[in-house]
Amino acid sequence: MLVLGIETSCDETSAAIVEDGRKILSNVIYSQIDIHYQFGGVVPEIASRKHVEKISYVVDMAFKQAGLTIDDIDGIAATYGPGLVGSLLVGLSFAKALSYAKRLPFVAVNHIEGHIYANFITYPQLTPPLIVLVVSGGHTNLIILKDFEEYEVVGKTRDDAAGEAFDKIARYLGLGYPGGPAIDKIAKQGDEDKYKYPVADVGGYNFSFSGLKSAVINHVHGLWQRGEEFKIEDVAASFQKTVVSILVEKTINLSLETNIRKIAVAGGVAANSKLRSEFYKKCAEHNIEFFVPEFKYCTDNAAMIASCGYFKLQKGIVSSYRENAVPYINLVSKKS
């Protein structure tokens, strides 16, 4: 089965064609990072306008790279949320119109759920059950994936997502946008044990990064106010170590508690080198298999949406054309 995926939830316009949920035939991404860099973050109005300009071109390129036409496609999947509403509407409307015109089944995909499926692209033989940590700029979710389209969300952030904390600390330290890669890079030159930052105890498998973010900002502000010398590299490294330790510890604990000895990480923060190395290390210590997507599939892309769409269509799930963009939506537990 060939599925066309479309992703426009934030500032990447992407289209991909995936075969049987795991084999990528094309994956085209138009990134707006250079446009939004000067503003220190994504400007929603600009993002949606750029999606309108590029969506047709990106979809055409996906077909050209795959050597296919729309007549070869068996279904269409598109992100419906969460994300920026203007951006979401561009890809969702395009997908629904194309589906209607060509009488192809259409399926709306939750962006958070889509990130999970980046692992099934990188590891074609990977199968559930597994523990999944989805960690990105807007979301931090800990999930038990029991089967395709059957999962339990056992933990989520109570406030800021991990990626959001990275972006805000990077902005405060003057490291620019996007913040995650900037902190990852500069932290390599710092002493991660220089500062000890507090971690909020929210119990269970939930997360909280707002207090940590405030503690780092207040600490740096105090150093500046007192005129004390310090290295931004040390702050970045210490902050990063704290975030990573929280994410790794809770994910490992869930794996041990459930005796599901497979862990997969997904989302933009999955590209963080410290997070990847710590997971490899801790999983090896506990005899747990670890999976993480290739770097190019950690950030937003349509291949993961097409993959997720395939598994939905295989289960007979088809969306209505009344499905609308939903900018604020969580991932909720689902039984098949």
UniProtKB/Swiss-Prot annotation:
Positions annotated to bind substrate: 134-138, 167, 180, 184, 272
Cofactors demanded by this protein: Fe(2+)
Annotated Gene Ontology cellular component terms: cytoplasm
Location(s) in or outside the cell: Cytoplasm
Gene3D superfamilies per UniProt: 3.30.420.40
Cofactor binding description: Binds 1 Fe(2+) ion per subunit.
The family this protein is said to belong to: Belongs to the KAE1 / TsaD family.
One BP annotation, GO: tRNA threonylcarbamoyladenosine modification
EC number of this enzyme: 2.3.1.234
Keywords: Acyltransferase, Cytoplasm, Iron, Metal-binding, Transferase, tRNA processing
Descriptive protein name: tRNA N6-adenosine threonylcarbamoyltransferase
HAMAP family, per the entry: TsaD
Residues binding Fe cation: 111, 115, 300
CDD domains, alphabetized: ASKHA_NBD_TsaD_bac
Protein's job: Required for the formation of a threonylcarbamoyl group on adenosine at position 37 (t(6)A37) in tRNAs that read codons beginning with adenine. Is involved in the transfer of the threonylcarbamoyl moiety of threonylcarbamoyl-AMP (TC-AMP) to the N6 group of A37, together with TsaE and TsaB. TsaD likely plays a direct catalytic role in this reaction.
Catalyzed reaction equations: L-threonylcarbamoyladenylate + adenosine(37) in tRNA = N(6)-L-threonylcarbamoyladenosine(37) in tRNA + AMP + H(+)
